[in-house]
UniProtKB/Swiss-Prot annotation:
Pathway: Carbohydrate degradation; glycolysis; pyruvate from D-glyceraldehyde 3-phosphate: step 2/5. It catalyses: (2R)-3-phosphoglycerate + ATP = (2R)-3-phospho-glyceroyl phosphate + ADP. HAMAP family: Phosphoglyc_kinase (MF_00145). The keyword Lyase does not apply. This is Phosphoglycerate kinase. It comes from Lactobacillus johnsonii (strain CNCM I-12250 / La1 / NCC 533). Keywords: ATP-binding, Cytoplasm, Glycolysis, Kinase, Nucleotide-binding, Transferase. The gene is pgk. GO terms for cellular component: cytosol. Monomer.
Amino acid sequence: MAKLIVSDLDLKGKKVLVRVDFNVPIKNGVIGDDNRIVAALPTIKYIIDHGGKAILLSHLGRVKSDADKKELSLRPVAERLSELLEKPVTFVPENEGKEVEEAIDNMKDGDVVVLENTRFQDIDNDFGKRESKNDPKLGEYWASLGDVFVNDAFGTAHRSHASNVGIATAMKKAGKPAAAGYLLEKEIKFLGDAVENPVHPFVTILGGAKVSDKIGVIENLIPKSDHILIGGGMAYTFLAAQGHKIGKSLFEADKVELAKSLLEKAGDKIVLPVDNVAATEFSNDAPHEIVGDDIPDNEMGLDIGPKTVEKFRDILKDAKTVVWNGPMGAFEMPNYAEGTLEVGRALADLKDAVTIIGGGDSTAAAKQLGIAPKISHISTGGGASLNYLEGKELPGIACVSDK
């Protein structure tokens, strides 16, 4: 079912509540990476260009104490947003109460207000985690501040919080619209097409430490993918399931039987490393060597080897749809980053394919290589994109009104 989007709404003179994802890294008041702020700009600009009053809500980090509040204020984000929009942005150091209501009452068409971190509602109250546990009264209060609601936070779409599901539910109950922003719409389009209607050959690339994080994705994508390429720590659980020696490599002993059943179910669709970069310890400075698919007892696999890279490249060169989630090795250490970087290069070389990257390390690799402009879509949601690839319904999308 197609969702209502921000451009379907009449925004002139309307108070537009927007749930954005401004959960950016901040240290000592300095923003380390403003990508998520930049990603929200198309929706914010559309609203203010069409005479709407943009009232922005976001969480930032996990708030467990008053000390966290000092570190996790959205004030630096509001200041950065003002620079990016090249216009004043009002920051309100509260997200409930008289100061909030007065700031909104004083807004003119085209103004932007940022309310304080929604997770400040997770402490110092009788309910408990009002935001994270979706206190309906909080959702109703926030909904009362606006005329329409736009959810543009894909990063929290797999969570049912007061600031997404709570507001949308209260809005719809009051006969007001709840729409998707441009970022949410883009995520639905790219991930939805990949999961539901991919152009073949469709190749899924999965990495990262744990099989347990990706079980649902593998099960959902086995029937849809032509190939599933597996690297990273999770590959060693699969190699162990095939009877290979994995030395001291990271693996999940309790998932070996499951890996066996996934291999049986997938037939030859699952492609595992045929060689590895192995070291005596988990350190960039440790002696390391290239070994086959059996790893010596005193070593651990920390990256895919050059033959595996070639094998993966050979499969990828014909792909028309590629979804990549998770690194091929211990990417944070230069000696074990090459497999991940080579996969990134292979994706960038594809000319007529839809390429989608999700997950922090895969995204970091794309940035390090400078290939982001050559990738069709880089997802802004880690857990949310995994849940989507599993075929799960995401509360933050389900709560948006259908067209």
